[in-house]
């Protein structure tokens, strides 16, 4: 994981291979299939094996969510190292068929991707993992703040986490999709608080919760009685 200042970022936008670009490393522990690059646990990135080798030294995208004060980012780092491979052959590629190899978790397989929630301090350039584990082979999703309508035409729209500078909201889902927790995380202490639990004997659908900023009340969309309703929870 690297960072650069705006001047160098603007250089990279013009020419990614500019040798005068200065960037600093925040982490050095990334490895294939467990990197800081935003790798999917459910499909490939569309690159053929030849393209992967050709582009292996290029910068890769990181999907991160910022705190409102821009002092921290949240990253879900996925460990795909034990997940088995899947292949796609493009038989009509010109001049010869191409092969794409990626990690893919099939139903019934034990080797599952593992989600790790990482908080990076963008003032000290340090990071720590938050323990959000509960369900076996769970999926973790940090909720993003909905952009204001008046920003829809802005050239730059940062991804900001739902919450405050010190707290963020996330969901964790069991492998069978029948249990979902809505949680709030205190990024300073690392404390994870379960706000509510959804559990059904069928698939549970979930929507992003609404947070009332002044009262800190919590609005949840749920089908717990067989119909979709909105529920209001106090602090």
Protein language model features and the residues they cover:
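Surface-exposed loop/turn elements that mediate protein-protein interactions on large endomembrane-trafficking
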Residues: 122-130, 184-194, 230-235
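Beta-strand C-termini and the immediately following turn/loop, strongest in propeller blades
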Residues: 2-6, 65, 74-79, 107-111, ...
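Long hydrophobic segments that form regular secondary structure
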Residues: 121-122, 128-136, 148-149, 155-170, ...
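A short beta-strand motif characteristic of beta-propeller blades
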Residues: 52-53, 128-130, 147-149, 193-197
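Signature of short aromatic-glycine-proline-rich micro-motifs recurring in repeat-based ectodomains
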Residues: 38-68, 116, 144-163, 207-220
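Predominantly five- to eight-bladed beta-propeller fold
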Residues: 9-65, 75-137
């Amino acid at each position: 994981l690297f960072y650069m200042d705006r001047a160098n970022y603007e250089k990279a936008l013009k020419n990614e291979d500019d040798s005068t670009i200065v960037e600093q490393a925040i982490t050095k522990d990334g490895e294939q299939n467990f990197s800081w690059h935003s790798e999917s646990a459910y499909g490939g990135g569309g690159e053929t094996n030849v393209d992967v080798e050709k582009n292996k030294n290029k910068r890769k995208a990181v999907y991160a969510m910022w705190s409102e004060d821009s002092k921290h980012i949240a990253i879900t780092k996925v460990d795909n190292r034990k997940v088995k491979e899947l292949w796609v052959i493009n038989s009509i590629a010109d001049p010869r068929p191409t092969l794409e190899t990626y990690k893919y978790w099939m139903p019934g397989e034990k080797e599952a991707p593992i989600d790790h929630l990482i908080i990076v301090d963008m003032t000290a350039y340090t990071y720590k993992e938050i323990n959000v584990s509960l369900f076996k082979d769970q999926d973790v999703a940090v909720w993003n703040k909905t952009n204001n309508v008046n920003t829809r035409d802005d050239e730059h729209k940062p991804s900001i986490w739902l919450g405050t500078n010190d707290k963020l909201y996330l969901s964790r889902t069991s492998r069978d999709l029948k249990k979902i927790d809505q949680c709030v995380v205190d990024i300073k202490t690392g404390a994870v608080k379960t706000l509510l639990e959804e559990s059904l004997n069928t698939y549970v659908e979930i929507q992003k919760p609404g947070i009332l900023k002044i009262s800190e009340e919590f609005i949840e969309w749920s089908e717990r009685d067989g119909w979709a309703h909105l529920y209001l929870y106090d602090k």
